């Protein structure tokens, strides 16, 4: 699929989609430092372009005839404060939508911070997508359940021309891992040498801890990397004494963003740290890319639609709530295959499984409730349990 990357930065999203088999034909970026970094890592052109000048951008992008446009418009202006303000960079979300709806690719993927979905700029963009015939899948993904060793929640709007809303939701939910990926497990998977058991990440407030273990996902990698201050005192939530604990190096942070060690970054440390923090984690991009490929190739989640209709019609669930139930059933099925047990026996087996016990109690309760609903549906419908990805043959 011919793909163009907008607001490409140093290339995290490009690399993720390229790794999933997409043909990246061009990238567009306006930060010269990121452009130079991109050029060192990709063979296709990266074009310096101010994407806020929409008419000029459309002319340039149309030349590449993309089937897919991907991109993460800058998100710094989506304030997290009580009185949320939006500036010029937030408006670039609307620019992205104007470009997409003028170029008219078959699909698009837009990434942003989770709170961007509530912004006025996104609401305008969303209306533009819908008015131009795009069905939308809107979802917040936790990167640690998408093959990234980092707790990073990101909003994705994935559009398909003439597709139904939510066309990719089931596949995205089905492909997520049951357990989050820890730093230790990621290092083991990649055969990296783990030189630390704990590390420092500068807290936004002195009321928060700064020391973290490699046995959990890392907190969100940000655009700055500060060393541990000499005056730092142990926080109540710090797992160990901080005396001999250091911050991650630039390359270690890049690994947490799932950039391979072969990816070349510039020597300017400040620029590099910002590029790393701003990037879409490579394997999160690959996760979304492979999910879209599954859809295009005809692979669909096969939990029959009658179950979803039953949840909405008989139990009063909204579309979103029914989707959450399905997501929890998928999660349970990955731990213990549903087809092997009846309802009561299945819940008992689930309770005795080590990986299920490691999940937070509140989540365990949610999963078991979802499973009970599914078996209740099966009892009255005589349907066979269907909770896998299958190839429909299309």
Residue ranges and their predicted role:
Residues 7, 38, 307-310, 332, ...:
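Conserved hydrophobic/aromatic "anchor" residues
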Residues 27-28:
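The conserved SAM/SAH-binding core of class I Rossmann-like methyltransferase domains
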Residues 36-46:
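Short, conserved SAM-binding/catalytic segment
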Residues 294-306, 384-389:
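Low-complexity, Pro/Thr/Ser/Gly/Ala-rich linker/spacer regions in secreted
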Residues 315-382:
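Non-catalytic DNA-binding core/recognition domains of DNA-processing enzymes
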């Amino acid at each position: 699929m011919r793909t163009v990357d907008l607001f490409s930065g140093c290339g995290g999203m490009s690399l993720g989609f390229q790794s999933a088999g997409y043909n990246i034909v061009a990238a567009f970026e306006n930060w010269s430092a990121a452009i130079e970094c991109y050029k060192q890592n990709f063979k296709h052109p990266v074009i310096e372009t101010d994407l806020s000048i929409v008419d000029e951008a459309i002319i340039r992008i149309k030349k590449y005839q993309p089937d897919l446009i991907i991109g993460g418009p800058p998100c710094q202006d989506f304030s997290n404060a009580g009185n949320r303000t939006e500036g010029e960079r937030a408006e670039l979300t609307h620019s992205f939508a104007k470009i997409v709806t003028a170029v008219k690719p078959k699909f698009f993927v837009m990434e942003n911070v989770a709170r961007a979905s509530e912004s006025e700029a996104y609401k305008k963009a969303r209306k533009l997508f819908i008015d131009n015939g795009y069905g939308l899948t809107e979802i917040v993904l936790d990167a640690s359940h998408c093959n990234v060793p980092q707790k990073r929640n990101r909003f994705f709007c994935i559009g398909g021309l003439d597709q139904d809303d939510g066309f990719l939701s089931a596949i995205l939910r089905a492909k997520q891992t049951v357990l989050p990926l820890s730093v230790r497990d990621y290092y083991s998977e990649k055969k990296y040498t783990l030189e630390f058991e704990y590390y420092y990440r500068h807290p936004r407030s002195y009321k928060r801890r700064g020391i973290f273990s490699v046995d959990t996902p890392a907190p969100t990698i940000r655009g700055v990397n500060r060393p541990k201050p000499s005056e730092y005192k142990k926080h109540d939530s710090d797992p160990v004494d901080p005396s001999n604990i250091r911050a991650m190096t630039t390359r270690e942070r890049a690994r947490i963003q799932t950039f391979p060690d072969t990816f070349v970054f510039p020597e300017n440390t400040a620029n590099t740290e910002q590029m790393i923090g701003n990037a879409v984690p490579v394997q999160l991009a690959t996760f979304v890319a492979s999910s879209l490929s599954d859809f295009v190739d005809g692979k669909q989640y096969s939990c029959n639609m009658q179950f979803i209709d039953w949840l909405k019609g008989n139990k009063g669930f909204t579309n979103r709530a029914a989707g959450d139930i399905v997501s929890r059933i998928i999660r349970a099925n990955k731990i213990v295959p549903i087809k092997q047990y009846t309802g009561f026996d299945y819940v008992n087996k689930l309770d005795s499984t080590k990986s299920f016990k490691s999940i937070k109690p509140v989540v365990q309760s949610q999963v078991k409730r979802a499973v009970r609903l599914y078996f209740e549906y099966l009892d009255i419908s005589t349907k066979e349990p269907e909770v896998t990805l299958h190839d429909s043959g299309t």
